Amino acid sequence: MTTYGIGTQTPEQALDSLSDMTTDLTPIQNDEFHARIAKAQAYMQANNIDAIYLNAGTNLAYFTGMRWYASERLVGAILPAKGDVQYIAPFFEIGSLNDFMVIDGPIRGWQEHENPYQLCVEVLSEMGISKTGTLGIDESAQFFIYDGINKANGNYNIVNAQCVTAHCRMHKSANELALMQRAMDMTLEVHKATASMLYEGITTTEVEAFIKKAHQKVGAPGNYFCIVLF
């Protein structure tokens, strides 16, 4: 009777069967971040978009390499159609942003009593962007960011920046495809190893703990999202 690879070894044996699968991979390098920025700027120039605001989160990370979670405080970057990116953040976060910075650029800080949206308008003006220019807002940005910028200057032609971000992100580089494929390969190996150590009476928390260890064994930091249900 076949077991389809389920319950054929102990958890220790299953972990021992795994090894680091990331040693031959090349992480996204600075030149690729610069290429992403250049691609976005070329699209912006061709479509008459003067600048885009990148909010903390996936788009900020994709174009600048800076990993920062969105919160109730404005943290992001302004990418003009021509010129260098500039970051905007609470003044007290500037040191931390410098620690996480991958693509260099000035950080414009705002104090708690100041209006961060007015600072955005000032930065755009310093970039040479007219107060009637076209500004793309990150599609993942909270409404209060759009609202704040619009109140600081109601003359902008504000558009959804998704036309820029999606245009860039949906077309993957060879290195991106290799990283994505390896991530899927790693996940599949973890699934196989997990199936192989299942036994009658095992709990969901034990399986979840194994999955975390298995991901670490193949070279990942651990689980990003894991739910085990029987």
Model-derived features: positions:
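Hydrophobic pocket-lining residues that define ligand/cofactor binding sites across diverse proteins
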Residues: 44, 198, 215
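Active-site pocket-lining segments that scaffold enzyme catalytic pockets across diverse folds
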Residues: 187-194, 212
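A composition/biophysics-driven feature that prefers long, compositionally simple stretches
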Residues: 1-189
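Acidic, glycine-rich loop-and-beta core segments that form the ion-binding/anion-interacting portion
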Residues: 210-230
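Conserved short loop/turn motifs at secondary-structure junctions
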Residues: 134-138, 194-203
